[in-house]
């Protein structure tokens, strides 16, 4: 493990006992204590580069104050424009930020765009209320008022997920501060239930990254290996990639669970990133609070089992980095300048690649996804329904195998980063996934398959495993 990875791991692990300390604290101590810890971590890991996050926060807050009814689009333009400046610092002869600064900036961008959207929703709701002449009851997810500058700073620097996620909305943060009976919210058991696979994933990461180092792909000797060996190598590279993020995101979720952050009654049917989808009245006593069943779906960032065993490329995106996927769906996909599912996905993947960075490998990887989505959608709608139940089961296994190979292939661009290294590796295996996807798309079109946006998702398999075997 690199020194940076050790630093991330230490930050994630210390957030767990800190969470237990904050869990039963009052709203004021939670707000300012969590912000102080987060700011301290930022200053320690980023040093003077912390200024970038402060400038981004102040700029967004100014836009919210100036144009509250249209601040969402303005905040999106501002934060994404600042990302370009932030990544071009070395080209401008300015000090290059640390990797930790980049991580803070990425999560901060998501939070500030979401905050601006929540403020805009509040103002639009107030306008409708004034126009109608009567007051409605509390609306699900709506903010009570516009956050002040200090409240915006406290949300932005809250230590929870400050470098690794999960992403959370200001409404989720506010609900944590105002939990009526935090002592009744379970933490220890959910934490242990969530944490148990992490040590195994960590060992698998260390073993796979040692046996199949990524650096080998950059060496000339690698390309003297036979084709089957070159094809196989992307499988353990993606395996190590998954194990690394599984450990990081499980640890990050455990930090949230320790603090009771993102806990809602099961009846609220919370979604990762978005929070509750149904209104649930707060409990009126500690006894009633203790009698409720809670979950932490709001801050769930990874479904490891479904990521590995879902059938389709489309579903693989849903279970990976789940809170960020919600953000992309809510703020990018829905406003995409197209109606087609594949074109909307291409737009979303383009901006997702930009959010990750300027390395060509990100764009090569992310922009392969829409081709795979179009191919699997057309071919599946053309052929799967014509098969017997046994044939459909066999289809799903083959589809799953190809889905995993597609992600193996795309992962190589994500980790190799450079244009030359990515294309060199893909060329060494003859761009097999690109050609396979094009062939599947052509066959699906020839057989009259419909576009993915017109297919009924309910009739399609999402996982090879029975529901009862899926990850809790």
Curated annotation (Swiss-Prot):
Q: What is its EC number?
A: 2.3.1.-
Annotated transmembrane regions: 6-22, 34-57, 74-93, 195-212, 232-261, 427-447
Activity control mechanisms: Activity is inhibited by thimerosal.
Q: What's a GO biological-process term for it?
A: regulation of triglyceride metabolic process
Please indicate which superkingdom the organism of origin belongs to: Eukaryota
User: Per its UniProt entry, what is the enzyme's top EC class, as one word?
Assistant: transferase
**Coarse class of the protein's main subcellular location:** endoplasmic reticulum
Query: What is catalysed by this protein?
Result: a 1-acyl-sn-glycero-3-phospho-(1D-myo-inositol) + (5Z,8Z,11Z,14Z)-eicosatetraenoyl-CoA = a 1-acyl-2-(5Z,8Z,11Z,14Z-eicosatetraenoyl)-sn-glycero-3-phospho-(1D-myo-inositol) + CoA; (5Z,8Z,11Z,14Z)-eicosatetraenoyl-CoA + 1-hexadecanoyl-sn-glycero-3-phosphocholine = 1-hexadecanoyl-2-(5Z,8Z,11Z,14Z-eicosatetraenoyl)-sn-glycero-3-phosphocholine + CoA; a 1-acyl-sn-glycero-3-phospho-(1D-myo-inositol) + an acyl-CoA = a 1,2-diacyl-sn-glycero-3-phospho-(1D-myo-inositol) + CoA; 1-octadecanoyl-sn-glycero-3-phospho-(1D-myo-inositol) + (5Z,8Z,11Z,14Z)-eicosatetraenoyl-CoA = 1-octadecanoyl-2-(5Z,8Z,11Z,14Z-eicosatetraenoyl)-sn-glycero-3-phospho-(1D-myo-inositol) + CoA
An example of a GO molecular function for this protein is: O-acyltransferase activity
Role = Acyltransferase which catalyzes the transfer of an acyl group from an acyl-CoA to a lysophosphatidylinositol (1-acylglycerophosphatidylinositol or LPI) leading to the production of a phosphatidylinositol (1,2-diacyl-sn-glycero-3-phosphoinositol or PI) and participates in the reacylation step of the phospholipid remodeling pathway also known as the Lands cycle. Prefers arachidonoyl-CoA as the acyl donor, thus contributing to the regulation of free levels arachidonic acid in cell.
Q: Where in the cell is it found?
A: Endoplasmic reticulum membrane
Q: How does it sit in the membrane?
A: Multi-pass membrane protein
- Choose one Gene Ontology CC annotation of this protein and give it: endoplasmic reticulum membrane
Please give the InterPro entries that the UniProt record associates with this protein.
LPLAT_7/PORCN-like, MBOAT_fam
Q: In which pathway does it act?
A: Lipid metabolism; phospholipid metabolism
Q: Which UniProt keywords apply?
A: Acyltransferase, Disease variant, Endoplasmic reticulum, Glycoprotein, Intellectual disability, Lipid biosynthesis, Lipid metabolism, Membrane, Phospholipid biosynthesis, Phospholipid metabolism, Transferase, Transmembrane, Transmembrane helix
Involvement in disorder: Intellectual developmental disorder, autosomal recessive 57: A disorder characterized by significantly below average general intellectual functioning associated with impairments in adaptive behavior and manifested during the developmental period. MRT57 patients have moderate to severe intellectual disability, and delayed psychomotor development with poor or absent speech. Some patients manifest seizures and autistic features.
Q: In which tissues is it expressed?
A: Overexpressed in metastatic breast and bladder carcinomas relative to normal breast epithelium and urothelium.
Q: Where is this region: Disordered?
A: 453-472
Q: Which residues lie on this side of the membrane: Cytoplasmic?
A: 1-5, 58-73, 213-231, 448-472
What is the name listed in the Swiss-Prot or TrEMBL entry for this protein? Membrane-bound acylglycerophosphatidylinositol O-acyltransferase MBOAT7
